[in-house]
Regions:
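Short intrinsically disordered, low-complexity coil segments enriched in acidic
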Residues: 1-2, 154
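Extended, charge-biased low-complexity segments
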Residues: 2-65, 72-78, 89
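Core of folded catalytic or high-affinity ligand/protein-binding domains
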Residues: 47-158
């Protein structure tokens, strides 16, 4: 009789199979929404909802990005916005009256940081951080631009 060995179960972040379209996870989104309604300060739930509902959006939007010359240049450069938005010296060069100036005022007023929000987005994620894949990069870019939408619309986190 052969002894069977138990296979080790993965305990760390899981790799995403980028060859398969991602599906929306409605149940996950609903559970996170209910938790968020119970505690509006639980920012982790916001990112759970976003991940659950995004489905294949990052892949589709990345393909759209590549349809323009400027988009192709952005994709080629692959600048990580959380790093750029965390560079206070760079932020301080942005002129008053610009979107960048409004972003600086937002950071000063709220005490938020781009890296802090990026960290929260991974607080319960079962995927690796900073995966080097075009769709993952684009998903991070969409996450990091989210604060800019708050600034432009005047929508506050509270």
């Amino acid at each position: 009789m052969m002894a069977t060995q138990a296979q080790a179960q993965p305990t760390g972040p899981q790799a995403i199979d980028w060859s398969q379209p991602r599906r929306r996870e409605w149940g996950t989104a609903l559970r996170a929404l209910l938790k968020l309604l119970g505690n509006a300060d639980d920012t982790v739930q916001v990112f759970r909802i976003m991940r659950a509902l995004n489905g294949d959006t990052a892949a589709k939007n990345y393909r759209k990005l590549l349809t323009t010359q400027q988009g192709g240049r952005l994709a080629y450069q692959r600048i990580e916005l959380s790093e750029r938005f965390s560079d206070r010296a760079w932020i301080d060069t942005l002129p008053e009256g610009s979107v960048g100036g409004a972003y600086r005022a937002f950071l000063d007023r709220t005490g938020y940081s781009a890296q802090g929000l990026a960290d929260v987005s991974y607080a319960d994620a079962e995927v690796e951080r900073n995966v080097e894949h075009p769709h993952a990069w684009f998903g991070r870019r969409e996450r990091d631009i989210h604060d800019i939408w708050h600034i432009l619309t005047g929508y506050q986190a509270d």
